[in-house]
Amino acid sequence: MRCLIFLCSGLLLSSHLFACTSAVISGRATRDGRPILWKQRDTGTLENKLVYHTGHTGHTGSTYAFLGVHNADDSANAEMFMGSNAVGFSIINTASYNLAYPQYKGKMDEEGILMKRALAVCSTLAEFEALLQATKGTRGVEANFGVVDAKGGAAFYETDPYSFIKYDANDPTVAPHGYLLRTNFSASGTPERGQGYIRYQTETDLFQWGFLGEGLSVNFILNEATTCLRHSLTGVDLARGPLPESAATPSIVSFADFIVRYSTTASMIIQGVAQGEPASLTTLWTVLGSPLTTPVLPVWVQYAEQIPPQLFAGHNRSAALNAASLRLKDRCFPLKVPEGKSYLDFGKVMNREGTGTLQKLRVVNALLVKEGTRLLEKMRSAKVTDPDVRQSYQEMMNAVGGYYASFGVDL
């Protein structure tokens, strides 16, 4: 009964307000021993861009180079919402809505500012904890911060303006299976408040199945979690139900409180490094748009200059890849009234002809992961050059362009 109350309380709250889904996975829980950090980002700002920040050394101190996702309209690149730096420190967040800090009267929603600062100056979990101590009483955040580092560290930090509580994914008493999940409430917060209880239950069921089955991996999260079409409260699984005949078959379905939904603007699966590997091998498997309409691309801080320009953007513009994703996504949500965001034309996503956006996406994603993994293995053996990276990206972008061209969308 208590679980049902949790689920219903989440259902009654807004579905689209900074409602992210995430996971911190220690190396002891993954198939290859490398930690994974995942964030499915939901926000009202649909346009995204990838941004590379160069490091520097000066009289006021040094900063690391780092790479991650910003809102497209962030002309000053002041807020980063998920990313990694040159020494393998990676960070994500989900907003929390059940922490208490009544004495704080300052500005809130500064999570992106704090994460950008952390990427610039932190190399380990311990240094992030020192940053949290240094910003006590001045940081306007209410969030679950997920962090991994190149030393095998993996943890969530439930954080308000004054305090934080660490949940260590390497501690068997905290994470018996080696992984931790968060949506939009904190375990240390007020029970039955917050948001995302339905998504949390869906995620819990999904990860338990994955952990006991094929194992937790980049492929598992990409194929099973980012595009999960199961609803844990109603029991609906759109992918397993009767599919519409074709993309042209009218097939409007209710689409609220799924892990992926209208407000999902990006997803990032950050694959850390094994013990003894260079931190530069940390890989950001990046979905720069809706997971229903956006192919995944691997990016690395050390090869930032080789990343295709379609992932970056000019002044106050979304990246070209993100813009193409949004144009295709627009067809999947044909109702343009405000409540239309909760109704999906499912035939556009999956159908019996196999022409849905997700069906074609799974084919191209398999090719992209294969090529990205091949390139990563060359990096691990120190046998890769800048021309190799450029050639690999060219092949990947040809596949991405072909995906959008099949729907008549220009990239």
Q: What name fits each language-model region?
A:
Residues 1-4:
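Positively charged n-region of N-terminal signal peptides that target proteins for export
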Residues 6-7, 17-18:
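Cleavable N-terminal signal peptides
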Residues 21-77, 82-83, 89, 93-120, ...:
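C-terminal, well-structured catalytic/ligand-binding subdomain of enzymes
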Residues 82-84, 137-138:
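Short, charge-rich binding segments
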Residues 110-143:
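Intrinsically disordered, low-complexity linker/loop segments enriched in Gly/Pro
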